Amino acid sequence: MGAGPVFCLGDIVGYGANPDEVVSWVKKRGVVCVLGNHDEAVLTGEVSWFNRHAAQAALWTRRVLSQESRAFLGALPATRIAEVEGLKILMAHGSPSDPLREYVDPSTHSDLFEFYLTKHKVDAVALGHTHVPYVWASKVGAVFNPGSVGQPRTGDPRASFATAEISGHQLSVDLHLTPYDIDTAAEKMQQAGLPPILWQRLYRGI
């Protein structure tokens, strides 16, 4: 599938066993990123509001992450507006108003979605954090979450991502699922000594 710019909505690191490799992959391909709450926790070491498994993984990542990767993550903005073919897309991990903490799920009232679009004068808002994919669209614009390429929360273990097509100054978003090598990811997490629940849940998509 042909593609233009690639966006990542945060949490580049924090759960998996290959954080430096992931950062290197993102940098090499020029992926446009924003900071996620797990990225921030790895940078600061502040994990008091994480559950113990997520906290352990974040602190492990903090110990093994290279200075080069830290510098890359530390330079990421909490929000950014990307312009693609004349359309403006606001990117945030959580929400536009609380980029690192707030969860915006599919049941969010449409008035709030429209508020995001009109307040920031954008054509679309792309969010992460929940690991649950959805697309909301109206005449005002679109708000979408591509889901997660790791640690899904939908009961489906496949990696989730979104593609957007622009035609006639209109944005249409499609969600996709694709299988990946869970066995290898889980094995590497076990070898790293990460909490078992974090690799076991990969098989269940929860």
What do the predicted segments below correspond to?
Residues 1-3, 84-85, 118-121, 167-168:
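Glycine-rich phosphate-binding loop signature in dinucleotide/nucleotide-binding domains
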Residues 1-74:
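Core catalytic region of metal-dependent phosphoesterases/phosphodiesterases
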Residues 6-11, 32-37, 92, 124-129, ...:
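Active-site neighborhood of phospho(di)ester-bond hydrolases with catalytic His/Asp-centered motifs
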Residues 14-16, 38-43, 97-98, 124-137, ...:
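Active-site environment of divalent metal-dependent phosphoester hydrolases
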Residues 49-56, 85-120, 152:
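Active-site-proximal segments of metal-dependent phosphoesterases and phosphodiesterases across multiple
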Residues 78-86, 136-138:
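Short acidic-hydrophobic surface loop/beta-edge motif
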Residues 106-146:
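Anionic-ligand binding region
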Residues 124, 136-206:
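Acidic, His/Gly-rich catalytic cores of divalent-metal-dependent hydrolytic chemistry
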